[in-house]
């Protein structure tokens, strides 16, 4: 869960001004994919609670006045939600079912499930706060792609380390958005002022939440996988043209030296990020479907995440 992102604007550095002293305006997109994501997560949670039907399976339900939507006991689920068995049936991340039964769809469905009301509210508030801003700046195609693909990356890494636990939650995709914000700052470094403050603030937010990921029962591997997936995708999808190039498109005077759309550093970062992403994504899938575990090669990595039967991201 991401609990601190809504307190600050981590990318608060403003765009540098042009020669006229005015900030170069970015196209403002209407945000609609992130609101749909939030609504979809809420609807899925309601469906899961309906299917869970606690009163017909247990006498220790909370908020019994809700009928079949009542919650499992605090002992069973302290986050006010369904049972682990219900989440597993509805598509939670489960290594055995993905590897042995080839239920690959779980790598995507798990990010739409939540362990409880508290889990859902924490994730969706942060997704809305971060995602709407990114979508307004870069559009629904790029932000939606980062959200889904980085969530998928988080699921892969989680499976490679957690073989005996189920995992649910949208935090892997949420960390993907944070990773994309960081790479966007780096690849468009020359277009921001106050960049030092912005990048330090963002790194502090990510660091604090990764630290919280070592507490039970959070799946920190999903956070890490989502963050690095979004970080690499941000270099590819959130690149801005140089301001000099944009200004030349507005008023190209005779004799003006035309600058390239992207500088050399931006192009190098794009190439390196694409190679690393393809290599990491492909190798992760290959290792997963071979039934292998990265714990065999990294003896200390288990310390990065709390390990239990159920994991919430």
From Swiss-Prot:
Biased composition (Acidic residues): 1-11
Composition skew (Polar residues), residue ranges: 15-24
EC number(s) reported in the record: 3.4.21.105
UniProt membrane topology term: Multi-pass membrane protein
One Pfam family from the record: Rhomboid
Transmembrane domains' residue ranges: 31-51, 112-132, 143-163, 166-186, 196-216, 221-241, 269-289
InterPro entries in UniProt: Peptidase_S54_rhomboid-like (IPR002610), Peptidase_S54_rhomboid_dom (IPR022764), Rhomboid-like_sf (IPR035952)
Catalytic activity: Cleaves type-1 transmembrane domains using a catalytic dyad composed of serine and histidine that are contributed by different transmembrane domains
Transmembrane among keywords: yes
Keywords, sorted A to Z: Hydrolase, Membrane, Protease, Serine protease, Transmembrane, Transmembrane helix
A molecular-function term among this protein's GO annotations: serine-type endopeptidase activity
Biological function: Probable rhomboid-type serine protease that catalyzes intramembrane proteolysis. May function in embryo development.
Protein name per UniProt: RHOMBOID-like protein 7
Organism: Arabidopsis thaliana (Mouse-ear cress)
Gene behind this protein: RBL7
């Amino acid at each position: 869960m991401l609990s601190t992102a809504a307190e600050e604007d981590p990318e608060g550095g403003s765009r540098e001004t042009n020669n006229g002293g005015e900030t170069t305006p970015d196209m403002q997109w209407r945000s609609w994919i992130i609101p749909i994501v939030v609504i979809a997560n809420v609807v899925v949670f309601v469906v899961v609670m309906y299917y869970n039907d606690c009163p017909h399976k247990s006498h220790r339900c909370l908020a019994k006045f809700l009928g079949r939507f009542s919650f499992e006991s605090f002992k069973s689920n302290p986050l006010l939600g369904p049972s682990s068995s219900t989440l597993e049936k509805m598509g939670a991340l489960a290594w055995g079912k993905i590897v042995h039964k080839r239920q690959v769809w779980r790598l995507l469905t798990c990010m739409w499930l939540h362990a409880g009301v508290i889990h859902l509210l924490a994730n969706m508030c942060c997704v809305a706060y971060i995602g709407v801003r990114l979508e307004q700046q870069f559009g629904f195609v790029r932000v939606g792609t980062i959200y889904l693909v980085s969530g998928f990356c988080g699921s892969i890494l989680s499976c490679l380390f957690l073989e005996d636990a189920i995992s649910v939650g949208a935090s892997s995709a949420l960390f993907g958005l944070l990773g994309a914000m960081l790479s966007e700052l780096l690849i468009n470094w020359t277009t921001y002022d106050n960049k030092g403050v912005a990048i330090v603030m963002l790194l502090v937010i990510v660091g604090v939440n990764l630290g919280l990921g070592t507490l039970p029962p959070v799946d920190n591997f999903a956070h890490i996988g989502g963050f690095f997936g979004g970080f690499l995708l941000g270099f590819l999808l959130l690149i801005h043209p140089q301001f000099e190039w944009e200004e030349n498109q507005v008023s190209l005077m005779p004799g003006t030296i035309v600058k390239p759309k992207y500088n050399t550093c931006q192009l190098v970062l794009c190439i390196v990020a694409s190679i690393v992403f393809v290599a990491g994504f492909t190798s992760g899938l290959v290792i997963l479907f071979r039934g292998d575990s990265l714990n065999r090669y990294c003896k200390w990595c288990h310390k990065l995440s709390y390990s239990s039967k159920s994991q919430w991201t």
